[in-house]
Amino acid sequence: MENLFGAKRLTATVGGKEIIMETGRLANQADGAVWIQCGGTVVLCTVCTQPLEREISFFPLVVDYTEKMYAAGRIPGSFFRREIGRPSERETLVSRLIDRPLRPLFPKGFTNEVQILANVISADQENDSDVLALCGSSAAVMLSSVPFEAPVAGARVCRIDGEFVLNPTITEAAKADLNLVVAANRDALVMVEGEADFVPEEVIAQALEWAHREVQPIIDMQEKLRELAGKAKIEFVAPEEDTELKEKAEALATADLAAALQVREKMARKEAKKAVKEKVKAALLQDPAFAETPERLAALGDILSSLEKRIVRQRILKEGLRIDGRDTKTVRPIIIEAGALPRAHGSAIFSRGETKSLVVTTLGSTTDEQRMDSLTGDVTKRFMLHYNFPPYSVGEVKPVRVSRREIGHGALAERALRPVLPSPDSFPFTLRVVSETMESNGSSSMAAVCGGSLSLMDAGVPVKAPVAGIAMGLIKEDDQFIVLTDILGDEDALGDMDFKIAGTAEGVTAVQMDIKIDGLPAEVMGRALAQAREARLHILNEMAKVLPEPRQALSKYAPQLSVVEVNPEIIRVIIGPGGKNIKAITSATGASIDIEDSGRISIFAPTKESMDMAREMVMYYDQRPELGKNYTAKVRKIMEIGAIVEILPNCEALIHISQLDTSRVEKTEDVVQLGQDVEVKVIEINDGRVRASRKAVMLEAQGVEWDPADTARPPRKPRDRDDRGDRGGRGDRGDRGGRNGRGGDRRDRR
């Protein structure tokens, strides 16, 4: 491609495909902009920053990934035909995929606003755009003036036919039994997200090590691009620590805070920590050094948080004891109630320590499938898992809305359960699982997995196997590390890793890992996976005590299902002109009917009675005429030789004029009229052609039993030309004369 704008371009081969990174062609007024391309898929990633005019205690990073419909040659389906409104679920998930590995790499204390936008501007529908957006966003930040520790490379690693493949096409990835998205820096992995079909833990560990080696060329590209076109970084100096405040606060708080951190109940511990802070603050305000400058105490919260982190970590490393008194491998007590809700199709309460979820399953028809507008066209989704995290679950007051975190946790639980679902052919219901977090003290997404599995089984969904999930943590200091099983919320915040693993007794179905430290040795990864398997098997055993297998029958409140097979040729008849027939069936019965081109019809109804009625009405259109059976037929056509009548939908028969009445009929219309209903008997079926008799029905009414021989079509008598006799001469008719009997000689008429 000709370089018209003086752009800087780099290429590299990664996973057998050429990756292009370019800057200087588009969005030159952004602080950093990168065009990243693989095949026909292009993502434009931009970074902008500006200082805030007010002081805040957090890093205001915003990441938005957007799929432009023009990228795939499509027009948005919205009313305004624009990409407006809230982002799609995929856009939200990819935005999180970019945010999670990048956010920890900005310097602590940096509070400038930073906005990262990743726009898909071309999509070939073969090369996925999510990992390109991650790589391009990292490269754009590297080029910008925003301080950033190191580049991050993203890639998809799949196992296809037993072999690892890096960044496969969308078609290839659909065949994989392991599909992971990884993000890594030069030294280690920093994020993992993916799903699997019962893959052993050892295979996942191998895939992650292999992926880290394979993504190094992408890191090289970003560093080279930075050398070619990078801007000078903002000179950021972290705020100076108030050492006097720190020393005095720690001296006042250490003993009381250590005691508060041994309170096992979450809310009581929260109150105890709050009391410690208030006590320390009151004591410091009595100190002349702070009494005159109370604004110095603004940093007290951060100082106590750092002290809390140090106390908790040291206790775990030295004593092997955690905040709630457990050792490093023990899973919190589990309590399960199946069938908790009387009217739900399936429900379960899953409680693990102070984390509790109410999970509900609802069955629907195929018309309830989620339909989405995407770059690949209109797609449908038959299984949905929605995770809700209301503010009361943590005793807080907040606006109620669906957050990105809730969407992400729901997607993780959905991936965990999807591999065990029955196929649409064997179980054509649409499935919606909702996890309502009732209480939360860590691992609520894994409670959604466990409760979701139980809820599906309670609903009678024939899952292949139960699924359980566990969240693993890590405490690492120098060369010493400890892996934690079933982490609390505080341990998640104070630890170095959040590694969620879900699966069956056979293998893993979903993983999600976020790492807060620079490197994760293979030994740590292996131990985390092994401990997670032990915990998962323990949880599955507890679940089996309550509900060892799916219910044998669906709830009486669930939709009733009947599947019938009909001749594909009569589908149009069942539907009717403009959908007239199918609408009449659904209106009369309240059923939902899904018709496939193969002739397979799924009938969903609220009750068995309405299902039976709908089935009967559908099968009415698939009837076949039976010899000797009487039918009420409608006259469709009057002919000289008889009448054409409709005896069944899409089936017509001929009533010969001789079969219209017991007496001789001169004209068909003397007996029947167009549109008239008449009682007839089928007297002949031959090669798809049907003959009927009104006469036979009339004779039966007179007590004369119908004899097929009486109404069968008489065989035609052979016509022998010799039987016609001699035509004889013309007799007294005279000569025919000339041409055409007009007399005279031909020449005479000239």
Curated annotation (Swiss-Prot):
Its cofactor is Mg(2+). InterPro entries: ExoRNase_PH_dom1, ExoRNase_PH_dom2, ExoRNase_PH_dom2_sf, KH_dom, KH_dom_type_1, KH_dom_type_1_sf, NA-bd_OB-fold, PNPase. Keywords: Cytoplasm, Magnesium, Metal-binding, Nucleotidyltransferase, RNA-binding, Transferase. GO terms for biological process: mRNA catabolic process; RNA processing. Mg(2+) binds at residues 492, 498. Residues 559-618 form the KH domain. Pfam families: KH_1, PNPase, RNase_PH, RNase_PH_C, S1. Belongs to the polyribonucleotide nucleotidyltransferase family. PANTHER family: POLYRIBONUCLEOTIDE NUCLEOTIDYLTRANSFERASE, POLYRIBONUCLEOTIDE NUCLEOTIDYLTRANSFERASE 1, MITOCHONDRIAL. This is Polyribonucleotide nucleotidyltransferase.
